[in-house]
């Protein structure tokens, strides 16, 4: 006789892939510890944190929660490409302000921009996509009263953008909270990084490639950014790379060639 004990409400597949959720949860906590292991100060993050499918996923969820997205000139181009008319540089019109730190436009500290944004008393999302490939950057967010979310990604550190995974710290109610409670984990991207966090610290890329970046920038007569992928310039020669007030030259291929990566 068929028992009704195994009848459930949610739609579940007949065959379920065997996944070790203990390893997944362990990775989530290891990721948090890894972030805080940097020689750069990391303080003042929201207490709740969730694994996301990279920061792009976190942005898409943010777009669902807030209508007008405020940004500074030179910010990460995805926001305008994805949201078009919902993105504004008039922060007084924004429902949330997204700021990359280091800043996408030059790879330098964004604390000056965060201070300005904080005066608007609107929720702030800090995008730390360049964490793990930067130096001399202070990630102390305790001075600010309006930071609701801070996101980190491993794509730039490990070159693993095709296996995206990030960690979103937030005081807001994001859809990812529902994912987690309903057992919709981002296992594939996380699994790719299970052992990688043990092989490199958040400062390893700078230690390995920082001097090469400086050498290349010297040869090109440009200024090294605090994010090692970039050199900065204000001449007409490189104006096609202009991002906001600065020409941002991505030299990652040159670094790879120089080091025979």
Explain the meaning of each model-derived region.
Residues 1-27, 34-261:
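PLP-dependent class I/II
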């Amino acid at each position: 006789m068929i028992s009704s004990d195994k009848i459930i409400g949610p739609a579940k597949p007949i065959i379920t892939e065997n996944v070790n959720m203990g390893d997944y949860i362990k990775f989530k906590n290891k990721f948090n510890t890894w972030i805080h292991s940097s020689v750069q100060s990391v303080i003042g993050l929201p207490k709740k944190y969730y694994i996301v499918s990279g920061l792009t996923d976190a942005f898409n969820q943010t777009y669902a929660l807030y209508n007008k997205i405020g940004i500074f000139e030179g910010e990460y181009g995805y926001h305008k490409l994805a949201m078009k008319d919902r993105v504004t540089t008039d922060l007084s019109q924004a429902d949330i302000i997204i700021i990359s730190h280091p800043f996408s436009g030059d790879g330098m500290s964004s604390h000056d921009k965060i201070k300005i944004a904080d005066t608007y008393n609107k929720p702030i999302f800090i995008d730390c996509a360049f964490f793990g490939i930067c130096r001399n950057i202070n990630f102390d967010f305790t001075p600010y009263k309006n930071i609701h979310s801070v996101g980190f990604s491993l794509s730039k550190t490990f070159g693993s953008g095709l296996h995206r995974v990030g960690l979103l710290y937030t005081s807001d109610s994001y859809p990812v909270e529902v994912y987690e409670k309903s057992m919709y984990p981002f296992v594939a991207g996380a699994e790719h990084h299970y052992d990688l966090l043990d092989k490199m610290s958040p400062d390893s890329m700078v230690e390995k490639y920082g001097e090469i970046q400086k050498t290349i920038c010297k040869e090109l007569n440009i200024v090294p950014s605090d994010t090692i992928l970039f050199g900065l310039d204000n001449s007409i020669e490189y104006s096609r790379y202009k991002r906001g007030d600065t020409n941002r030259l991505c030299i990652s291929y040159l670094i790879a060639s120089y080091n025979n990566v």
